Amino acid sequence: MRTITATIEKASDGGYGIYTDIPGLIGSGLTEEEAKADFCGVLKEQAAYYYERTTTYPDWYEEGYEIEYRYDLSGFFLSFPFINASEFASYVGINPSLMRKYKSGLVKDSAKQKDQIQAKYNEMIRNLERVKF
């Protein structure tokens, strides 16, 4: 079974875009749910189109697949608007101005910064899981 990693981002129209490293597999929508539904539809359409052209399905389709959704930072802040980008930046140890650029999609984070952000985010989630009301 193949895992298809699909990245959720903020689209230029203010909605959501989803992309992968597989050519042609994209989705979009005004909401995250719409974009995911569109992405799944395109995935099936692309497999059918490939079959029409070659009489075989793509490897990722024949072997079975699961979709792992990930966020880029613009998509993360769009999906979770109650998280303040500047405060989150301070928590994860990144310049707040740079984080706001990530949020708006003007700049993409490096692999090193993604790792740093993910590690601090995981720490934050562990801390939040201990909270009781």
Residue ranges with predicted function:
Residues 37, 101, 119:
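DNA-binding alpha-helical recognition surfaces that contact promoter or target DNA
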Residues 1-55:
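DNA-contacting interfaces and partner/effector-binding or oligomerization modules
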